Amino acid sequence: VRHTDSELSELARQLKSLDGETRVVMEATGNYHAPVAKLLHDAGLYVSVVNAKLVHGYGNNDLRRVKTDKKDAVKLANYGLDRWLTLPRYVPEEDTRLLLKNCYRQYRQYSKVQTVLKNNLISLLDTVFPNVNRLFSSPIRGDGSEKWVDFVAEFWHCRCVSEKSERAFTCKYLHWCRKHGYNFSEAKAYTIYAEASGHIGVMPKSETTKLLVEQAVSQLRAISAALTALKQEMRTLASQLPEYSVVMDMFGVDPTLGPQLIAEIGDARRFYSKKALVAYAGLDAPPNDSGDVTGKHKSMSKIGASSLRRTLFLVMSVYLQNAPLDEPVYQFMDRKRAEGKPYRVYRVRPGFQRRTIRSQ
């Protein structure tokens, strides 16, 4: 069956024509199952989308493991029959939440690409203008541009600076700062000139070298602009959801982390308790007891949304940087630190992260 409207509609018609109660059980396989689940749900069928990990570990009591589509279908059918009465019903996400989640997925992908492109540009500059990226400490602008990136687009080789006199470069740097809206510092101009004069470019100052640097800068600027656009769109989408004001009032949550939390958690009303939300993030510590032995050192399961754990880790970093003494989460962390817990333990301790997520 192809994923077209006509063929999926015919599939829904045939399923509805079957005698008795019909339920459709599917594995959550990326986005491949989404159009099928949505159309069958809209057709009035009972659809259940099951975590693939649950099905994978179901009924593995054979010595001979067979992996074919037919065997997987039979296994999935048996799973559905065994849990017929407890199969969770598939409910399509709201359009706003769906768009927000996909925006964040793209944002994460582009962030990885930005890191690769930034490292590539720095590596290239090591052959033409070493350490130039370390000469500037200006924060990233709202449009995603960075001062050192804009600088190397103009002064792409150390000889572009050192061939001029110190006075001539200072004047040119002044005009460049005014043109791009950056603050000018005469001391900074002297530092840049001294740095450029002390280096010898491995690659010659040529049109080919200029092309390489310009292309690297162009790619980095493009991905930075895309990230800025996605970040703004995520804020717009998140602000339309009812929990936005509550999340944004939390300590450690800024206009960037707030939409990320909302995107990863989704509709919090679908969780029956706080523990369910903790387990969804993979921060739960399963029991580890046997006989008379009661396990005391339990690590978190990490069976859950890794991207949500990453966002929570960033929120915890804000706690560590600001040390708010009146915040319960920081008080918990500080207490564990006073007990002598190692730095990495009290920073990523599951209990600390669980308290962070429960405060939401």
Describe the residue ranges of each PLM region.
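A detector of single, family-specific signature residues
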Residues: 1-360
